[in-house]
Structures are given as structure tokens and as C-alpha cells.
């Protein structure tokens, strides 16, 4: 039986931290769906289509990863995709508390959906998309946190290139 995992998130933008978690998940499961949430309430910098396109570009080296956009309840999306594993990156205790609640809510709606928590590599444990956007808005160098194509797209969005 093939195992299919979903790694959901807003990925606004996708960072080396996300790619670190995704790469390790791709080594653990037959198929990993990088599921990019529309997340309109978060007022994303990039449209869903842009985030999907950037993610596809920077994950080409992972043959068992598929990038898809979605805009529904994660548990329902997982059922439709016939996925039984939900991948989540956990950087801190506060992340874990939130993820634990989310895992229990997902399990309420999809009892066969198990959450697997992965810790980022130590050098990426402080990286978050929102922090990187803030650094970029204040003219900080974000090139060590983002693939070049993503950094370029972000700087263009900010009118800095």
C-alpha cells in the first residue's frame, strides 16, 4: 500500500525551512502533496497561483512531490486526496501547542488522518515566512533563507528590484 502525505501551509513565500521539512518528508513517504492554502484571511503577499508556481519551481528536484493549491477544510481535502498523513514543521514549544490543537481538530473530522511533526534543521529553526517578509521590507538580506527565484519575486513585489 502506498502512503500519501500532505504538507499543508500558506507558504507565503516558500522558504528553505519549508524545503528542509519537505525534502525529509519526501524521503519518508511514497508521495507528498505540498498543499498550498489560499489563506485569504492572512492577506498573503503572493496570490495562490504565484505561490503554487514558485513552489513547483523550487521543488522540481523532488520527484515524489506534487504541488497543489486548495481552499477548503484540510481534513476534507486530505480525504479527497486519499492521504492519511499530515506533515507539520514544529520550530518551538509554542508551535507545538498550536499544532497539537490543530492535529486533534483534524482527527475529529478525519479519524484516519495522522499528524507527523518534523523539526527543522537547527540552522533553520528560527525561519518563518512572516519574519522573512518583515526583514525584506526593511531592506535586510533574505538570500540565505529563500531560493533565489523566490527572493527575486519577493523583492519585485516589494518594489525593491
UniProtKB/Swiss-Prot annotation:
It is found in: Cytoplasm. The record marks 18 as: Transition state stabilizer. One of its GO terms (molecular function) is pantetheine-phosphate adenylyltransferase activity. CDD domains: PPAT. GO terms for cellular component: cytoplasm. Gene3D superfamilies: HUPs. Keywords: ATP-binding, Coenzyme A biosynthesis, Cytoplasm, Magnesium, Nucleotide-binding, Nucleotidyltransferase, Transferase. Homohexamer. This is Phosphopantetheine adenylyltransferase. It comes from Proteus mirabilis (strain HI4320).
Amino acid at each position: 500500500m502506498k502512503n500519501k502525505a500532505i504538507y499543508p501551509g500558506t507558504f507565503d513565500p516558500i522558504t528553505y525551512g519549508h524545503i528542509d521539512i519537505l525534502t525529509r518528508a519526501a524521503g519518508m513517504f511514497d508521495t507528498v502533496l505540498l498543499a498550498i492554502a489560499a489563506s485569504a484571511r492572512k492577506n498573503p503577499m503572493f496570490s495562490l497561483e504565484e505561490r503554487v508556481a514558485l513552489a513547483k519551481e523550487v521543488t522540481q528536484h523532488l520527484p515524489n512531490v506534487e504541488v497543489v493549491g486548495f481552499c477548503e477544510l484540510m481534513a476534507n481535502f486530505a480525504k479527497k486526496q486519499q492521504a492519511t498523513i499530515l506533515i507539520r514543521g514544529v520550530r518551538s514549544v509554542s508551535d507545538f501547542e498550536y499544532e497539537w490543537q490543530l492535529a486533534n481538530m483534524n482527527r475529529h473530522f478525519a479519524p484516519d488522518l495522522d499528524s507527523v511533526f518534523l523539526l527543522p534543521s537547527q540552522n533553520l529553526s528560527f525561519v518563518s515566512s512572516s519574519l522573512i517578509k518583515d526583514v525584506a521590507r526593511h531592506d535586510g538580506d533574505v538570500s540565505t533563507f529563500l531560493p533565489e527565484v523566490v527572493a527575486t519575486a519577493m523583492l519585485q513585489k516589494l518594489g525593491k528590484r
